[in-house]
């Protein structure tokens, strides 16, 4: 029977070919890709950007819940939040503090840091531009970091260690893409803090340690008090994540956590804690990130929704960390 159907299929295909009709395949071969295979079409962000003015908070909540189940694995109670992840999303929808916008904007954050703890802790700025066409790449140093100010994560920042080896056209295209209005971090999962950020491209001095390694110390502050620090190390190979409590003892809130109680405390740890708590004081929750070089520390960024509120924590830790957040009064 299969042979008969196969024969009929061949005959029909030949007849269609005679009359110039092409039978489309369900799965066509992947076409050859150009050498610049980087075009990114963020469908959901574009849809949210086009339609956000029509959305109600209930519809935004529905959208977050769909992403949450897909990425975290349980259905979140955003109306009566208990876990860390749930409370992050509650604040995204209900706590619209303008100071958060100042702090998530990687350009305006520099003034907030300078005013509150000192300009010596700000990563030095090389330049700021409103569009990629304004950047004179020839004038930039051999090493630098360049980023768009209204997003977080590696998609919005680029590290250049040797300018002679970069593809400037590729970098320009990436930066131009990240400046598009739908790339605003708000349209990913409705984190309000980003919504009113004015997009800019900034270049900063390249920060490094003498040994080439640069650890990232992410300090989690609840009500302005440090509870724990996430250390990201070995970023040039396979990144390791260590969670340290206030006594610098390891704990494992997720399956990715590495337990190593021999990992050294940064030599300027106490100063980091003091600065983190001062910068985070106005907020119910905030994470303050630091870099430590040979003899200096810098504030890298401040974030209010780690991993966009889709963290893969063990439930006991999701609940415990959630209990440390006292929800504020709503601010529309």
Where on the chain are the PLM-derived regions?
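A short, surface-exposed helix-loop junction/capping segment
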Residues: 83-98, 252-260
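Short, surface-exposed beta-strand-loop junctions and turns on beta-sheet-rich folds
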Residues: 152, 235-237, 305-307
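C-terminal active-site "lid" helix and adjoining low-complexity regulatory extension at the edge
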Residues: 292-332
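A short, polar/proline- and glycine-enriched secondary-structure boundary/capping micro-motif
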Residues: 157-159, 238-244, 309-313
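Membrane-proximal basic amphipathic "stem/tether" segments
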Residues: 1-94
């Amino acid at each position: 029977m299969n042979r008969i159907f196969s024969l009929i299929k061949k005959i029909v295909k030949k007849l269609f070919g005679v009359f110039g009709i092409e039978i489309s395949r369900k799965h066509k071969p992947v076409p050859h890709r150009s050498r610049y295979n980087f075009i990114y079409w963020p469908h959901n962000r574009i849809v949210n950007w086009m339609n956000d003015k029509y959305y109600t908070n209930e519809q935004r909540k529905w959208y977050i819940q769909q992403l949450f189940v897909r990425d975290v694995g349980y259905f979140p109670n955003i109306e009566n939040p208990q876990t860390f992840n749930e409370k992050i999303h509650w604040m995204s929808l209900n706590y619209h503090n303008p100071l958060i916008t100042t702090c998530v904007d990687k350009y305006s954050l520099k003034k907030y840091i300078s005013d509150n703890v000192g300009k010596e802790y700000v990563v030095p700025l090389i330049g700021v531009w409103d569009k990629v066409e304004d950047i004179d790449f020839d004038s930039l140093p051999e090493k630098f970091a360049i980023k768009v100010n209204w997003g977080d994560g590696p998609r919005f920042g680029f590290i250049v260690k040797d300018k002679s080896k970069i593809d400037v056209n590729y970098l320009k295209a990436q930066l131009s893409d990240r400046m598009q209005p739908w790339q605003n971090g708000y349209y990913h999962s409705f984190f309000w803090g980003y919504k009113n950020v004015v997009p800019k491209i900034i270049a900063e001095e390249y920060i490094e340690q003498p040994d080439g390694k640069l650890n990232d110390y992410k300090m989690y502050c609840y009500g302005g008090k440090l509870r724990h620090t996430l250390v990201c190390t070995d970023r040039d190979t396979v990144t390791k994540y260590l969670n340290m409590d206030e006594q610098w003892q390891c704990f494992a809130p997720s399956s990715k956590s590495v337990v190593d109680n021999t990992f050294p405390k940064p030599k300027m740890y106490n100063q980091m804690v003091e600065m983190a708590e001062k910068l985070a004081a106005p907020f119910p929750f905030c994470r303050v990130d630091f870099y430590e070089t040979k003899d200096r520390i810098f504030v890298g960024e401040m974030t209010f929704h780690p991993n966009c509120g889709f963290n893969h924590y063990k439930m006991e830790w999701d609940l415990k960390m959630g209990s440390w957040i006292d929800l504020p009064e709503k601010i529309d």
